[in-house]
C-alpha cells in the first residue's frame, strides 16, 4: 500500500487507536510526555516498570560480539524490545527512527563498515547527549575507522525533513520500540516511504496488542512511556 495515504482507514486500523494525550493536550503533549519519561523518569533500563521494553531475546553471535564493545552507558540507557538490525548490510546508508542512546546505531555502524553511513534521529536531548558523547571514540578507537560513520540528529520521526533527512537518501530504516510512542503513526510510515531509496527496506521491532486498548491505558503517561499506551 502507498504509505503516503496517511488518511486511509486501513492504515489507521493497522496503526491502532490514537494515543490520548495526557491532560487532554494534542500531539505535542504526547511528545512532551515521552520526552519527560525517557529524558528524566528513566535513567537506566532498571527503572522500567513493565517488561514491554527490553523483553529477553536471543541475539545472533555476531551482534553479541559487537554489543560487547558498545559503551556501557549507551547500553544502560537502551529501552528497545528486539533487534531490528539485519546482518549483511555492508556499505549501506542506515537510518534509525527514535535512536535513543544510540545502541542500535552503534551496532549498525559496525555492520555497515567504514564505507557505510548511519544516522539516528531522536527528539530527547538527554538520550542524544549520550549517543553523541561516545560516537567518535567508538568509531575511531574501537572500530578503527578514520572518522565516525554515525551521526545523531534531533527531530521527530513524523517530520524527518525538519531533521534534514532528504528524499530517497537511505537504503535501510530500523526502529526499535518507538513507532508505538508516536501520536501520528501514519505520518511515520509516510516519512519512511519518502526517505527510502528505491528497493530500500524498513525493519522494526515494536509492541502490538490483539484487541482495542481502553482509554485508561491509552491516556496513562506511564503506560505510554512503557510502550503499552500506544501499542499497535
Question: Can you say where each PLM-predicted feature lies in the sequence?
Answer:
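N-terminal auxiliary segments of SAM/dcSAM-dependent transferases
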Residues: 3-57
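Conserved alpha-helix/loop element of class I SAM-dependent methyltransferases that forms part
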Residues: 53-93, 104-111
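Class I SAM-dependent methyltransferase SAM/SAH-binding core
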Residues: 89-97, 101-160
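Helix-to-beta-strand junctions that scaffold the AdoMet/dcAdoMet cofactor pocket
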Residues: 113, 182-183, 196-197
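A short acidic, Gly/Pro-enriched loop at the edge of an enzyme's catalytic core
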Residues: 159-172
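A short SAM/SAH-binding and catalytic strip from SAM-dependent methyltransferases
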Residues: 171-184
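A short glycine-rich, Lys/Arg-flanked "PGG" loop and its adjoining helix->strand segment in the class I
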Residues: 186-201
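Short, glycine-/aromatic-enriched active-site segment of Class I SAM-dependent methyltransferases
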Residues: 207-229
Amino acid at each position: 500500500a502507498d504509505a503516503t495515504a496517511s488518511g486511509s482507514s486501513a492504515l489507521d486500523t493497522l496503526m491502532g487507536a490514537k494515543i490520548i494525550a495526557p491532560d487532554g493536550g494534542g500531539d505535542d503533549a504526547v511528545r512532551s510526555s515521552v520526552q519527560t519519561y525517557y529524558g528524566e523518569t528513566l535513567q537506566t533500563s532498571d527503572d522500567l516498570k513493565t517488561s514491554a521494553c527490553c523483553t529477553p531475546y536471543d541475539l545472533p553471535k555476531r551482534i553479541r560480539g559487537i554489543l560487547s564493545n558498545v559503551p556501557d552507558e549507551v547500553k544502560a540507557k537502551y529501552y528497545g524490545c528486539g533487534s531490528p538490525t539485519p546482518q549483511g548490510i555492508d556499505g549501506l546508508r542506515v537510518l534509525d527512527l527514535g535512536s535513543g542512546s544510540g545502541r542500535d546505531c552503534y551496532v549498525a555502524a559496525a555492520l555497515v563498515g567504514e564505507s557505510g553511513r548511519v544516522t539516528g534521529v531522536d527528539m530527547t536531548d538527554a538520550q542524544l547527549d549520550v549517543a553523541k558523547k561516545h560516537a567518535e571514540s567508538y568509531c575511531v578507537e574501537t572500530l578503527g575507522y578514520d572518522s565516525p560513520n554515525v551521526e545523531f540528529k534531533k527531530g521527530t520521526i513524523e517530520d524527518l525533513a525538519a531533521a534534514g533527512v532528504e528524499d530517497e537518501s537511505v537504503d535501510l530504516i530500523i526502529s526499535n520500540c518507538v513507532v508505538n510512542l508516536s501520536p501520528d503513526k501514519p505520518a511515520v510510515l509516510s516519512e519512511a516511504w519518502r526517505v527510502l531509496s528505491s528497493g530500500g527496506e524498513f525493519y522494526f521491532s515494536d509492541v502490538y496488542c490483539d484487541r482495542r486498548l481502553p482509554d485508561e491505558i491509552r491516556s496513562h503517561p506511564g503506560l505510554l512511556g512503557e510502550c503499552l499506551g500506544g501499542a499497535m
